[in-house]
């Protein structure tokens, strides 16, 4: 997986030519900026698949295996010794091949799309994708329906996450974690360059003192969402003109060199090392690192969810459902959070376990957000077919 890429003249040209991106992006390969623009045209706005996912033979009864592809920083101890994952393996007898190669939704989906379109196995039994991409998989018939009899703990799902537009009733997906996109800074470097200890707005990223020391996320809904919110727009109900105004800002900052990189999870090592001073950033990546700080802009943060799906033709569907059920047990969900996965758990009843293991962590609004905190967040709207064509 490409962790991050410099904005080359070629990729900058792609941004300048956004209106022609459908033809230009055909040969864009893995350029992060191209992935960003492609995200503008990816939607999954219905909960009924246009085609039925191909179901392969479930070998779970004879093969105690599970291959799980996830994002980095989403498992306590990255699934190693003493983690919740090893507990699941011991309790279930299932050997889990757990990998963290998902850097952004588009890059990962592109890596398996050919198999999915040809109705060939991807080799994965669980993949974790953000709402909008999960919707695309479901709509395209790339995800298998869940057997809820194998997941009785799904009843513990946060009620607000049950009836989502892309999967009403959660027949194909279950949330893994939710989180927020705001602004992360390297405290020492940011203070040295700006003389400030905190950042209050997206506009603060455009300070000339930070030129070339800024990155933005390749997740279009987060970066464009934050910019539109800074312009006073509601990202749950914006117009094409609103989107184009925000895109014009981003174009200008890329063309001027203010923005150094467009990146997925690869921004984090750069932020930790001080190569960059600030970035649009995901809450759980930055929270807990004493050298970094994460801020909700005054205009608000975006709120998103990453979801577990079982790909079409997965070989170990029942084993995958057993893993989902394990992590929806409140005690296991609490151990996962207490182990360092500082995102919003989809299992609010995990809080007593977290309180027992780490009382301070249980007070963290980035894990158990209050209604007041959530009031300053927005969820990016589901794109219509027309908007999909326009963007």
PLM segments and residue spans:
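Mature extracytoplasmic/periplasmic domains
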Residues: 306, 311-375
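Early extracytoplasmic/lumenal segment of secretory-pathway proteins
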Residues: 58-135
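Conserved C-terminal helix/tail region of periplasmic/extracytoplasmic solute-binding proteins
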Residues: 369-391
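A structural signal for short loop-to-beta-strand junctions that line the ligand-binding cleft
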Residues: 120-129, 144-185, 213
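Short beta-strand->loop
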Residues: 144-155, 173, 291-302, 311-313
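Bacterial lipoprotein signal-peptidase II cleavage site
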Residues: 41-49
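N-terminal secretory signal peptides
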Residues: 1-19, 30-37
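Ligand-binding pocket segment of bilobal, Venus flytrap-like solute-binding proteins
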Residues: 213-219, 223, 227, 231-297
């Amino acid at each position: 997986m490409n962790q991050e890429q410099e904005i080359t003249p070629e990729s900058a040209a792609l941004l300048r030519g956004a209106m022609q991106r459908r033809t230009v992006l055909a040969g864009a390969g893995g350029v992060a900026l191209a992935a960003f623009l492609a995200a503008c045209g990816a939607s999954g706005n219905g909960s009924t698949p246009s085609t039925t996912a191909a179901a392969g033979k479930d070998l779970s009864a004879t093969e105690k295996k599970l291959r799980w592809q996830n994002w980095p920083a989403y498992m306590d101890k990255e699934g190693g010794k003493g983690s919740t994952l090893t507990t699941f393996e011991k309790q279930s007898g299932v050997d889990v091949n757990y990998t963290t190669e998902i850097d952004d939704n588009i890059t990962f989906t592109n890596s398996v799309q050919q198999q999915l379109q040809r109705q060939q196995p991807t080799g994965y039994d669980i993949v974790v994708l953000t709402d909008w991409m999960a919707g695309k998989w479901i709509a395209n018939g790339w995800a298998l329906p869940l057997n809820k009899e194998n997941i009785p703990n799904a009843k513990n799902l946060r009620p607000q996450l049950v009836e989502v537009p892309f999967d009403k009733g959660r027949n194909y997906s279950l949330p893994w974690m939710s989180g927020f996109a705001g602004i992360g800074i390297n405290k020492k470097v940011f203070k040295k360059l700006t003389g400030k200890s905190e950042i209050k707005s997206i506009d603060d990223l455009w300070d000339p003192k930070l030129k070339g020391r800024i990155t933005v996320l390749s997740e279009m809904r987060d970066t464009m969402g934050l910019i539109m919110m800074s312009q006073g727009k509601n990202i749950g109900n914006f117009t094409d003109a609103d989107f184009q105004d925000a895109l014009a800002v981003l174009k200008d900052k890329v063309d001027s060199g203010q923005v150094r990189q467009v990146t997925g999870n690869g921004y984090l090592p750069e932020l930790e090392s001080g190569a960059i001073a600030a970035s649009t950033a995901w809450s759980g990546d930055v929270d807990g690192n004493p050298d970094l700080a994460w801020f909700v802009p005054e205009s608000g943060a975006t709120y998103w969810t990453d979801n577990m799906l079982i790909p079409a033709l997965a070989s170990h569907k029942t084993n995958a459902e057993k893993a989902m059920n394990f992590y929806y047990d409140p005690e296991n969900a609490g151990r996962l959070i207490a182990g360092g996965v500082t995102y919003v758990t989809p299992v609010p009843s995990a809080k007593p376990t977290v309180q027992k293991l780490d009382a301070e962590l249980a007070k963290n609004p980035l894990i158990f957000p209050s209604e007041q905190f959530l009031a300053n967040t927005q969820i990016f709207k589901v794109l219509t077919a027309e908007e999909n064509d326009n963007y």
